[in-house]
Amino acid sequence: MLYYLLQYINELFDPPGFGVIEYITFRASAAAITSLLITILAGPKLIGYLKSKYIEPVKEEAPPEHRQKRKELPTMGGTLIIFSVVVSGLLWAKFNDPYVWLILLSILWMGTIGFIDDYRKVVLKIKGGLSAKYKLIGQVSLGLFIGFYTRFDPAFSVLLTETTIPFFKDLMIDYGWWYIPVVVFIITAVSNAVNLTDGLDGLAAGTSGIVVFGLGGFAYLTGNAVYSEYLNIAFIPGGGEVAVVSMAIVMACVGFLWFNSHPAEIFMGDTGSLALGSAIAVIALLIKKELLLPVLAGTFLLETLSVSLQVTWFKFTKWRFGEGRRIFLMAPLHHHYQMKGWAEEKIVIRFWIITLLFFLASLMTLKLR
């Protein structure tokens, strides 16, 4: 919106300095600042409203100390993240870029699924909220839409069903008709992974912010013909606009941490975690970096694997020995360390550090090929 207004003023009057609106870096920075300010300024009012309406029920399987600390805190804070990102994205990104719309759509789509889940748990007092079946339907539906749209719309003709492989130079893989199932799988897997990670104050917001920052950097490089040629990575015309929305997401997460850092005043709930997870997946798919996610988003992978291993081992040992046994004290992984007596703040910061290391490892793929 502001992009087109400032562009019109620049073409009409040619005032000094207005040409900067054409630069991705300027608009990404502006979107970041706008998103941060919206989150911080709107946060207190939203928290006050949610405190009077929506208090998150604590999971019964959570550690006792964790349950005690989390009583009487509002959820659905993800609405703040979504609002900040959508407003900032619409203000500073180009309307005619389909990449922008698909990212914003995915955030709103999965944010709505998460909101319904939170609403059923908090307001309707339905234990478990939205059933796993309907969550899966929502995730698969989004995946099918994104898959078919990017597969058959001419705007996405570059590479189409091909993608790059990390650590290998000039090596591409063509999904062919497997492309759409791959899109569905990645969106479902990543949104669930972020949802599993959202269990401690600041954990999901911090790790998501780091991952999206990395994706935003890759988006900027893939959308720049000079940088992409120099680094020998896929060039995607118009993909640079993804960086604008990415920075809005990053700073929405940072702004949310203002209220969600320990001791938290609000939780993002499934509204936020599912929205962030879908955004990460869609951004990675659009810039052809989905195969880099196991490295860049390694923290989410570890959290998901801890749950999968725990459940699988428990079922196997129950079948084999007559009683279920556990690998971890509790899953996901962050609760394992909680049960070991680690302070919540220490777990969160260490997971942030691990995510930063994964981010640096992903940067190394630009040269280690």
From Swiss-Prot:
It catalyses: UDP-N-acetyl-alpha-D-muramoyl-L-alanyl-gamma-D-glutamyl-meso-2,6-diaminopimeloyl-D-alanyl-D-alanine + di-trans,octa-cis-undecaprenyl phosphate = di-trans,octa-cis-undecaprenyl diphospho-N-acetyl-alpha-D-muramoyl-L-alanyl-D-glutamyl-meso-2,6-diaminopimeloyl-D-alanyl-D-alanine + UMP. Pfam families: Glycos_transf_4 (PF00953). CDD domains: GT_MraY. One of its GO terms (cellular component) is plasma membrane. Pathway: Cell wall biogenesis; peptidoglycan biosynthesis. Its cofactor is Mg(2+). It is found in: Cell inner membrane. One of its GO terms (molecular function) is phospho-N-acetylmuramoyl-pentapeptide-transferase activity. Keywords: Cell cycle, Cell division, Cell inner membrane, Cell membrane, Cell shape, Cell wall biogenesis/degradation, Magnesium, Membrane, Metal-binding, Peptidoglycan synthesis, Transferase, Transmembrane, Transmembrane helix. It is a multi-pass membrane protein. The chain crosses the membrane at residues 30-50, 73-93, 99-119, 140-160, 171-191, 202-222, 239-259, 266-286, 291-311, 346-366. Its EC number is 2.7.8.13. Catalyzes the initial step of the lipid cycle reactions in the biosynthesis of the cell wall peptidoglycan: transfers peptidoglycan precursor phospho-MurNAc-pentapeptide from UDP-MurNAc-pentapeptide onto the lipid carrier undecaprenyl phosphate, yielding undecaprenyl-pyrophosphoryl-MurNAc-pentapeptide, known as lipid I. Belongs to the glycosyltransferase 4 family. MraY subfamily. This is Phospho-N-acetylmuramoyl-pentapeptide-transferase. The lineage of its organism: Bacteria, Pseudomonadati, Chlorobiota, Chlorobiia, Chlorobiales. The gene is mraY.
